[in-house]
Design a protein with these regions (language model features):
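Catalytic cores of eukaryotic secretory-pathway lumenal/extracellular enzymes that build
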Residues: 21-26, 35-36, 43-45, 49-50, ...
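Beta-strand-loop-alpha-helix segment that lines the small-molecule cofactor/substrate pocket
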Residues: 1-43, 58
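Short, conserved clusters of charged catalytic residues that mark active-site
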Residues: 20, 46, 102, 208, ...
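Short glycine/proline- and charge-enriched loop/turn segments
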Residues: 6, 82-91, 268-273
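C-terminal helical cap and adjacent loop that interface with cofactors, partners, or active-site loops
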Residues: 207-315
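Predominantly a Rossmann-like dinucleotide-binding segment in NAD(P)-dependent oxidoreductases
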Residues: 42-198
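Structured beta->alpha junctions
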Residues: 14, 40-43, 70, 229, ...
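A short acidic, glycine-rich active-site loop
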Residues: 12, 89-95, 274-278
Length: 315
């Protein structure tokens, strides 16, 4: 309807959990001659942008294999995919689409050629009722005898955690998902009565807590992707192996390591990300700047146009 009225679109990912709808929107965008940009924001970051330029410039020769890991972090997974908005596939989408379509998009972009085959394994192994420890309760603040030793305890995550807790000065995400304008008092009220105070072993979640994807691309290059809830830190890491060298990267540190065979390692420190650019390694703000410039210039093809994003959704 928006395209019919002549609007340009900026779409949150995924485009749709249904392939037919993704392809229909792609077709409609062409018919309407409108800009449709999907929020695959990682393409706009300095980290992945620099990596892309190195690969396209032949820094490590021909790409033969790529390994990418999304370290979700135990507390982030518990917040979003056990207690939170994306805990049920039927109400949102599968984990690989809800969380990791960013990664599928980046892998396809970096490889530079179409993906020809995909296989995947994953399951929900840990956040299940049978794994609830003896003495646990339905809610973390309802007399749970296991609170002290449980890293998934809601009070730890939203009150005390040095990254996510309000006592560390964080009054934004994830605390702001529980209540508007978070305070410690308001958060405790939400934990006593709302979904984010539930025991992680007694929720109605059904999305996988770990998954591995193997891909084969045109020309024979291969890639693997691992998504895991069971990590201490929340960040992405990557290693690309080519015929003349390798590149390894840590997005949290914003550093790339270029190792050309037979030569000294080059450390590419991409610098500290300013607060304004903090979301997704700077990608959120940079994408919106890019979209405004794209529309002002009358362009139809962007880094994450619907055409560029459709194939990664198919993957």
């Amino acid at each position: 309807a928006a395209l019919d009225k002549g609007y340009h679109l900026v779409l949150e990912k995924p485009i749709s959990p249904l392939l037919d709808e993704c392809l229909a929107l792609q077709k409609k965008a062409h018919e309407a001659n409108r800009v449709v940009v999907v929020c695959h924001v990682l393409r706009y970051t300095k980290f992945y942008g620099t990596l892309y330029e190195l690969l396209r410039g032949g820094a490590i020769g021909r790409i033969e294999s790529l390994d990418a890991v999304e370290n979700v972090a135990y507390w982030h997974y518990a917040h979003s995919y056990v207690r939170g908005n994306w805990h049920k596939t039927a109400d949102s989408s599968p984990m690989i689409l809800a969380k990791s379509c960013h990664d599928m998009d980046i892998i396809r972009w970096l490889m530079g050629v179409p993906c020809e085959s995909v296989s995947s394994y994953g399951s929900l192994d840990w956040f299940r009722a049978e794994n609830a420890p003896d003495g646990s309760a339905d809610r973390c603040l309802s007399g749970c005898a296991c609170k002290e030793g449980c890293p998934y305890d809601a009070e730890k995550i939203y009150i005390f955690n040095d990254k996510s807790g309000i006592r560390s000065g964080n009054d934004e995400w994830p605390c702001s998902v529980l209540v508007n304008k978070p305070t410690e008092e308001k958060l405790y009220d939400a934990l006593r009565t709302g979904p984010y105070g539930r025991c992680v072993y007694r929720c109605d979640n059904d999305v996988v807590d770990h998954q591995v994807v193997s891909m084969r691309f045109a020309g024979g290059a291969t890639a693997t992707f691992t998504m895991s809830a069971f990590t201490a830190k929340c960040y992405r890491s990557i290693k690309v192996m080519g015929t003349m060298g390798e590149i390894e990267g840590d997005m949290d540190a914003n550093v790339l390591y270029l190792r050309k065979f037979g030569q000294p390692e080059q450390v590419l420190d991409l610098g500290t990300i300013p607060d304004r650019f903090a979301g997704h390694g700077g990608g959120d703000a940079l994408m919106m700047d890019y979209v405004c410039e794209l529309i002002a210039a009358g362009g139809a093809e962007g880094l994450t146009s619907v055409d560029a994003s459709a194939e990664s959704h198919v993957m």
